[in-house]
Amino acid sequence: QSQRRDTYGKYARLLVERGHAYYCFCEKTESEEDSGEFGRAPDPCRDLPLEEAQARVDAGEPFVIRQKIPRGGTTTFQDAIFGDITVENDTLDDQVLLKRDGLPTYNFANVIDDHLMGITHVVRGSEYLSSAPKYNLLYQAFGWDIPTYVHCSPVMRDAQNKMSKRHGD
């Protein structure tokens, strides 16, 4: 991902220009940046005029780029196993797409890479269902086709542990 920093930056800036993301200059801990969990307080940077935000970027002020989740309403996505799933947008956080060091978050890189590689089906564990609405909103913001999601139950090594490549399963 570090070798493709320019690619991810280009797409993140495109979302800012289209109003689907914003520059955030707030000082949050790295864990808060990565998780998007910071008390769900409204981000004061969310509604900064683009010209003001761009001037701060141009002046060298550190920033992240956050996804601008629509306020109110719902987002529905389809899963091949679970069917249609609808979530309230108010339950979704404005996740970080591009970190202060210019590297993308895993979730943002996934969407960009899957699109650029022509991925049509995304198969993953059901524990990742909660990420799908944000992915959908990103695909829609770019005007890209949304892949077919297939969220499966985890395959278990034993009664307590999922199979894992890390453990040689």
Listing of model-derived features with the role each one plays in the protein:
Residues Q1-Y11:
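Aromatic/His-enriched, Gly/Pro-containing loop or helix-boundary segments
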